[in-house]
Amino acid sequence: MLLLPFQLLAVLFPGGNSEHAFQGPTSFHVIQTSSFTNSTWAQTQGSGWLDDLQIHGWDSDSGTAIFLKPWSKGNFSDKEVAELEEIFRVYILGFAREVQDFAGDFQMKYPFEIQGIAGCGLHSGGAIVSFLRGALGGLDFLSVKNASCVPSPEGGSRAQKVCALIMQYQGIMEIVRLLLYKTCPRYLLGVLNAGKADLQGKMKPEAWLSSGPSPGPGRLLLVCHVSGFCPKPVWVMWMPGEQEQQGTQLGDILPNANWTWYLRATLDVAAGEAAGLSCRVKHSSLEGQDIILYWSNPTSIGSIVLAIIVPSLLLLLCLALWYMRRRSYQNIP
C-alpha cells in the first residue's frame, strides 16, 4: 500500500482528500487474454484501462503499446516506456512458452484460455492498493498478494502446484513486485494528472424516449435513452409525478466512442397506465436542472399516412373542380 504525497492530493482532490472528490477514474489496470489452441500456437491480447476507459492497446505483431490518448504515457519518459514495452514483450513470449511446456504436467487440455488483470487503485485517505489476479477458463485461479502467489479455492490442487512453481522464479517475482508496488502507483498518479482535463470534464446528457418490443398483450415497454454524459455517475428513473416508479430496470452504463456514456432505463407497464409517466435524469453537469421527458403515445404510421394523403386528395379534388369549371366557361359562346 502506498500513500500519496500531500502535494499531489491537493492537485487531484482540490475539494477534499477522498476518492469521491475526483470526478473521474481512480484505478489503472492492464488486461491480458492468452488463447492456447495447441502445443505450438498461442495468441495474447493486451490492453490498458483507467476504470472502464481504455487508454492503451497492444500490437502483437510489433510487440509495442498503442497509446489511445495524447496523455496515455502519463509522466513517463520515452525511455521508460520503451523499457516497459521490452519487459511486456519478453513476458508475453516467455509466458506462452512456459505454459505450453508445463501444460501436460498440469493436465491442461487444449484449447484453453488464461486471463490476467493487474494494476493499482486509489482508495480513501490517499492509499494506493495494487492487485494481480489470474483466471483459467473464466474461473479464479490465483492472485499475487504481498509479492506471494496465492492459489484460489476454485483452482484446486492445480492452482497450488502452479503457485509453487511460480514462487521458484524469485527474479520474476521481484520484477512483478516492482511493477505492482512502484511502477503502477507512479504511473497512475502521473496519468491522472496528465489527463485531468479530459478525465474531469463534464458533458451534459441527451435523453429521448422510445417504445421497445411489446412485453405482452395490452402492455408497453417504455424506454428512456440517456447518452453523451460525463462523468459516469448518473441517476435515471421512470416516475409518475414526483415518485419513483417501481419496476424501472436500468441497463449497464456503456462507453461511447467519444469517452462519454450511455444508459437506458426501461419500464413494463399496462398500456392504460403509460399516460402521465415521465423519465427523469439527474447528472452533475446539469447543475440541478434535471431533464424530464413525458411519455405520450407515439403516432402510428397509419395516422401519419392519413395526415399526408387526405389533404393531398382534397387539394387534387379542388384543382380538378377548378379545371373543370374553367373549361366549362371557355366553352360558352
From Swiss-Prot:
It comes from Aotus nancymaae. It comes from the Eukaryota. The chain crosses the membrane at residues 304-324. It is found in: Cell membrane; Endosome membrane; Lysosome membrane. The gene is CD1B. This is T-cell surface glycoprotein CD1b. Gene3D superfamilies: Immunoglobulins, MHC class I-like antigen recognition-like. Residues 325-333 are cytoplasmic. CDD domains: IgC1_CD1. SMART domains: IGc1. During protein synthesis and maturation, CD1 family members bind endogenous lipids that are replaced by lipid or glycolipid antigens when the proteins are internalized and pass through endosomes or lysosomes, before trafficking back to the cell surface. Interaction with saposin C is required for the loading of bacterial lipid antigens onto CD1B in the lysosome. One of its GO terms (molecular function) is exogenous lipid antigen binding. Residues 185-295 form the Ig-like domain. The keyword Transmembrane applies. SUPFAM superfamilies: Immunoglobulin, MHC antigen-recognition domain. A motif (Internalization signal) lies at residues 329-332. Disulfide bonds join C120-C184, C149-C163, C224-C279. PROSITE patterns: IG_LIKE (PS50835). Keywords: Adaptive immunity, Cell membrane, Disulfide bond, Endosome, Glycoprotein, Immunity, Immunoglobulin domain, Lysosome, Membrane, Signal, Transmembrane, Transmembrane helix. Residues 19-303 are extracellular. PANTHER family: MHC CLASS I-RELATED, T-CELL SURFACE GLYCOPROTEIN CD1B.
